[in-house]
Design a protein with these regions (language model features):
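Short, Lys/Arg-enriched N-terminal segments with co-localized hydrophobic residues
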Residues: 1-10
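N-terminal capping segment at the start of a domain
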Residues: 30-46, 194-196
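Cofactor-binding active-site loop characterized by glycine-rich and histidine/acidic residues
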Residues: 40-41, 52-183
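Generic beta-sheet signal
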Residues: 80-82, 158-162, 189, 250-258
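Glycine-rich beta-alpha junction loops
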Residues: 88-89, 93, 196-197, 231, ...
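Short acidic, glycine/serine/threonine-rich loops at helix termini
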Residues: 94-96, 123, 173-175, 201-205, ...
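Thiamine diphosphate
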Residues: 129, 133-136, 141-246
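Glycine/aspartate-rich loop-and-adjacent alpha/beta segment that forms the canonical ThDP
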Residues: 232-307
Length: 307
């Protein structure tokens, strides 16, 4: 799908098709941010690294290809909104904001320490580029509904992206918000469900089954895409389709169900719920980086084969 976007810093003048070069650029950016996430957890002593790594591809492509944002003017009225509903994954989100220029790297080096602006949960009153404070799970989609309705009332058009976790979808408030998004025909809402199948207490299926997520959101009135959450091409095509739906006057919000792995890319973390939260010393960080070297090579090889 090739859309003539009229959005953001990258569009239309700097917009490029999703070709091999662009795909590789995003792969390398995601690799850099995964490493940044782990290093930040070392600086801060600990962090919710598992869910941050499972969602990093989503945040990478949004912030580096799609979102209409300006680090020099972070409060511009028509900016796209991003809601990290799984707010505990700030250790992954903060590096994304630093990389885009919303704050200096020095802030990461004091992550979650006394006096730091950024902690385990982001505070929108302290951190440039953060649209809302999150952490109490289940409320991100409700906030996005409010943002979308406010834009409609004020005559301002922007996209509202929400990143939730599958464990978070245990919360009933998500489904009240889903009903509202469909009822008010908020086609500028795109919900990403990070379906990594793990939560703090164990496997999601053992705690509270949420599948089939695609059929559930479809029943709630959403356009639904189910993708490999670690495949940039699949993410790109789903996001482009969601934006096109809105630009073409569609009347449904979009849900993108991302099948992912907790701790993606780090062999001793991957698919292990015990890495929902954890700490790394220098030895573990070195092992993680070595694993990420192999992971990047595998992903770039896939690009060479499929692009």
């Amino acid at each position: 799908i090739l859309i003539k976007f009229e959005r953001g810093i990258f569009m239309p003048a700097n917009y490029v098709p999703f070709d091999k070069e662009e795909w590789l650029r995003l792969e390398k950016k995601a690799d850099r941010l995964r490493r940044y996430c782990l290093q930040t957890a070392v600086w801060g002593g600990s962090g919710h690294v598992g869910g941050s790594l499972s969602a990093m591809d989503c945040m990478t492509i949004l912030y580096n290809r799609f979102m209409k944002i300006d680090p020099q003017n972070p409060d511009m009225p028509d900016r796209d909104r991003f809601v990290l509903s799984k707010g505990h994954c700030a250790v992954g989100y903060a590096p994304v904001l630093v990389d885009r220029g919303f704050m200096p790297e020095e802030e990461l080096k004091i992550f979650n320490l006394t006096g730091a602006k950024i902690g385990m949960h982001m505070d929108c009153n302290k951190v440039r580029g953060v649209d809302c404070s999150t952490g109490s799970l289940g409320h991100g989609l409700s906030l996005a509904v409010g943002f979308a309705l406010a834009g409609r009332v004020n005559g301002i058009d922007y996209m509202n992206y929400v990143l939730t976790g599958d464990g978070e979808l245990n919360e009933g408030s998500n489904w009240e918000a889903a009903m509202s998004a469909a009822q008010f025909k908020l086609s500028n809402i795109v919900l990403f469900a990070d379906n990594n199948k793990c939560m703090i207490d164990g496997r999601v299926d053992d705690e509270m089954k949420v599948e089939p997520l695609d059929k559930k959101f479809e029943a709630f009135g959403f356009n639904v895409f189910r993708v490999d959450g670690h495949n940039m091409k699949e993410l790109n095509d789903a996001i482009e389709a969601a934006i096109k739906n809105h630009q073409d006057g569609g009347d449904k919000p979009t849900a993108i169900i991302m099948d992912t792995f907790k701790g993606a890319g780090v062999d001793f973390m991957q698919d292990d719920y015990k890495w929902h939260y954890g700490s790394l010393d220098d030895e573990k960080l070195a092992k993680a980086y070595a694993s990420l070297d192999k992971y990047l090579a595998e992903r770039c090889a896939r690009v060479e084969k499929e692009a």
